[in-house]
């Protein structure tokens, strides 16, 4: 095993031994942020039990990809993603898949490392059926339009100040104490004109 890999494994093991009860915490992102900051975004089913590699302290889940929304270029010549990798311990942000339904589809947004898909507790991994119509539309086509120019800017405390005209102020967490508010479920931060972004509703228009 390479020296760096051995060192990384030792550090992970040490963290687990000295702080077994310390939970991994993170602030859930707006779905558009999750899309834009991820290398690969797919819809997939978890079809296998976790397999733990005790040398690297990582585990992998076998998945069946049903749709890819982002990552075609990053994958290169690879035609499919068969496994998703995560730290083996939740104390170091390892993802633990709870659902036993192997036919249930999940939206998975993660990072590619050496051609392998990695996720953590902080990754955006949610049942596809739990997403709103607007969120599904966003992951399918719309969020990508805002990645290069626009930024969802989370408001942590009042007063909130935007740092740029290309930022959209996200207040769901502050006002509702939840990342599942109206802005998360129905809005996308999209370019309106050069140098300007604004919230745009993705809900279907009523006749």
Swiss-Prot record:
Gene Ontology BP, a term: positive regulation of cell population proliferation
Function according to Swiss-Prot or TrEMBL: Metalloproteinase inhibitor that functions by forming one to one complexes with target metalloproteinases, such as collagenases, and irreversibly inactivates them by binding to their catalytic zinc cofactor. Acts on MMP1, MMP2, MMP3, MMP7, MMP8, MMP9, MMP10, MMP11, MMP12, MMP13 and MMP16. Does not act on MMP14. Also functions as a growth factor that regulates cell differentiation, migration and cell death and activates cellular signaling cascades via CD63 and ITGB1. Plays a role in integrin signaling.
Gene: TIMP1
GO molecular function, one term: cytokine activity
Glycosylation sites recorded in the entry for this protein: 53, 101
Cited SUPFAM superfamilies: TIMP-like
Lineage: Eukaryota, Metazoa, Chordata, Craniata, Vertebrata
Covalent S-S links between cysteines: 24-93, 26-122, 36-147, 150-197, 155-160, 168-189
Leader peptide range in chain numbering: 1-23
InterPro entries assigned to the protein according to its UniProt record, in alphabetical order: Netrin_domain, TIMP, TIMP-like_OB-fold, TIMP_C, TIMP_CS
Protein name per the record: Metalloproteinase inhibitor 1
Residues modified to Phosphoserine: 178
One GO CC term on file: extracellular space
Record's subunit section: Interacts with MMP1, MMP3, MMP10 and MMP13, but has only very low affinity for MMP14. Interacts with CD63; identified in a complex with CD63 and ITGB1.
Positions bearing the site annotation: Involved in metalloproteinase-binding: 37
Domain NTR residues, every copy: 24-147
Cell location: Secreted
């Amino acid at each position: 095993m390479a020296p760096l890999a051995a060192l990384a494994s030792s550090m992970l093991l040490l963290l687990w031994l000295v702080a077994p009860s310390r939970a991994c915490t993170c602030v859930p992102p707006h779905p558009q942020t999750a899309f834009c900051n991820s290398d690969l975004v797919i819809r997939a089913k978890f079809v296998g039990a976790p397999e733990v590699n005790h040398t690297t302290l990582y585990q992998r889940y076998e998945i069946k990809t049903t749709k890819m929304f982002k990552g075609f270029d990053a994958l290169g010549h690879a035609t499919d993603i068969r496994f998703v990798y995560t730290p083996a311990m939740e104390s170091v942000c390892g993802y633990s898949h709870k659902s036993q339904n192997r036919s249930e589809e999940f939206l998975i947004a993660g990072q590619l490392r050496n051609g392998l898909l990695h996720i953590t507790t902080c990754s955006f991994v949610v049942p596809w059926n739990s997403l709103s119509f607007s969120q599904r539309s966003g992951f399918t086509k719309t969020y990508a339009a805002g990645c290069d120019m626009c930024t969802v800017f989370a408001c942590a405390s009042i007063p909130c100040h935007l740092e740029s005209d290309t930022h959209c102020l996200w207040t769901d967490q502050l006002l509702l104490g939840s990342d599942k508010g109206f802005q998360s479920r129905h809005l996308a931060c999209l370019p309106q004109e050069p140098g300007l972004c604004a919230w745009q509703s993705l809900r279907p228009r009523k006749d």
